[in-house]
Amino acid sequence: SYIEAIGGREKLSMVKSIIERSEASMQGATIEVISQKNNKRQAITELKMMGNVMQKQVVNKDKAFMEMQGQKIDFEGQTLKDMIQIAALFPELNFDLNSVEFKGIVDVDDKKAYEIKISETKSNFYDTSTFYKIQTIQTQEIMGNSQTSTVKFGDFKQVNGIYFPHTTTLSMGPQAIDFKSTGIELNTTIDASLFE
């Protein structure tokens, strides 16, 4: 299974926090993404360009919001549920097997993958040979508009005995952005005020 493939339940349950940093280039500018999560259902993802925070997504237990260009948007409904789920350090540890649905084996680029529908708006895809999660497809309602995003994961490497993807490709519509990991830290203390 995926949990065993990336390190095993025992190792994963010892992780208290994850800080991930990655970078991408878009139209000549460098985009930096900093994601910080703890084991209390709190997570923050900041998107920075030239040192300035362009967008911020925060999950704080049972609430989630996005800040963009000075505007704060609270997430609701299924999008809120999905945000809370992915705020977990390793969401797969918490899956309710009665509520996920196996959809079949599909092609993801040049790989065969198991498609698992985990909610009304989100599916995960796991490589049939390695069991790594190689893709997610999610539909979000933002300000009345429905947006579908595809995230692909690759270049899996160990950090403290746990495998993490070190490349991530985010696609929304015709645009795709390739992010490369610049650092992953486990069990670093995260300032609780970030989630307010």
Regions found by a protein language model. Give the residues of each.
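Structural motif
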Residues: M26, M49, M68, V108-D109, ...
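Flexible, processing/modification-adjacent segments and terminal tails
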Residues: N60-K122, Q140-T148, L194-E196
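N-terminal mature ectodomain segment of secretory-pathway/periplasmic proteins
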Residues: E4-Q71, V100-E101
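Short, hydrophobic/aromatic-rich segments at coil-to-beta transitions
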Residues: M14-R21, N39-E46, V108-I116, Y132-Q135, ...
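Short beta-strand segments
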Residues: A29-V33, Q55-Q57, I73, K122, ...
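Gly/Pro-enriched, hydrophobic low-complexity segments
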Residues: K112-E196
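Generic beta-strand structural signal
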Residues: K37-N38, V58-V59, D107, Y126, ...
